[in-house]
């Protein structure tokens, strides 16, 4: 039997997304992490389009990290994402959608790495 209760992570995700959509008209940088992989994508919610994405599943990352999600893998994903965002042009400012994840560990490491590359989050 499926429970009607909403889990803590789902409540956190809804709360974060509601604040982002209410306060911003900027593009949204959304992340997803699992035990083995880390994914990031830049989304325009107005037209429902993904402009750029990167993950630890890409060959450049797998060759270096041996399929483990750690700070080194996240730094490489941030580098890939910054290269793709620079190709888009004037995409330097966006909102950071951390989803149900707390802003610690590799989530904060990824955000700080993007800030180091000159993006405003």
From Swiss-Prot:
Lineage, top-rank taxon, reads Bacteria
Q: What does this protein do?
A: This is one of the proteins that bind and probably mediate the attachment of the 5S RNA into the large ribosomal subunit, where it forms part of the central protuberance.
**What protein is this chain from?**
Large ribosomal subunit protein uL18
A Gene Ontology CC term for this entry?
Answer: cytosolic large ribosomal subunit
Give a Pfam family name.
Answer: Ribosomal_L18p
Q: Which GO terms describe its molecular function?
A: 5S rRNA binding; structural constituent of ribosome
> Source taxonomy lineage?
Bacteria, Pseudomonadati, Pseudomonadota, Alphaproteobacteria, Rickettsiales
Membrane-crossing segments per the record: none
Q: Which GO terms describe its biological process?
A: translation
Species source reads Ehrlichia canis (strain Jake)
Gene encoding this chain?
rplR
Task: Name the family the entry cites.
Answer: Belongs to the universal ribosomal protein uL18 family.
Alphabetized UniProt keyword annotations: Ribonucleoprotein, Ribosomal protein, RNA-binding, rRNA-binding
